[in-house]
């Protein structure tokens, strides 16, 4: 079993070997998986008691996901700006508002010059920063990152880790990163 308390605004890394349950933990916190036993409370809400509809709302507004594989984060036929807008289609009707927010998020992650680039025109690190902007699109309280630096070189890895620290400090967002190193 596991007993874990993560405070609001905390930056935390869960480190362990492959198969140790790191991604499963992240998926449970994200409302994507349910355990066979136990309890999980996020912001005072019992995730395991939520209906499917409540879980959808939780995932839309409480958590943002960054996956290791960029293919899970980005649509290849859309620009960075368009990709970041995708999660907003369900909540923001005004196209100008979506575009402005997406642009601002891309600037926040250091990609002002890549707003009109397609994923195939970006490096792995740039794609991962677009993925972080996507995860922030609906102002989540918690940012969940599953091996976010697993597919990039060490210099880019350091830059992405610094970005998570910056977002944690500037936005006060809780950041949970799982990694094997």
What kind of region is each of these model predictions?
Residues 15-17:
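The feature captures the beta-strand-to-loop junction immediately N-terminal to the Walker
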Residues 30:
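Helix-to-loop junction immediately C-terminal to a conserved catalytic motif
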Residues 38-46:
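Conserved ABC transporter NBD signature motif
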Residues 77-85:
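Short coil-to-helix segment of the ABC ATPase nucleotide-binding domain corresponding to the Q-loop/switch region
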Residues 118-122, 126-128:
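Conserved ABC ATPase signature
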Residues 139:
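Conserved catalytic motifs of ABC-family nucleotide-binding domains
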Residues 143-146:
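Catalytic Walker B motif of ABC-type/P-loop ATPase nucleotide-binding domains
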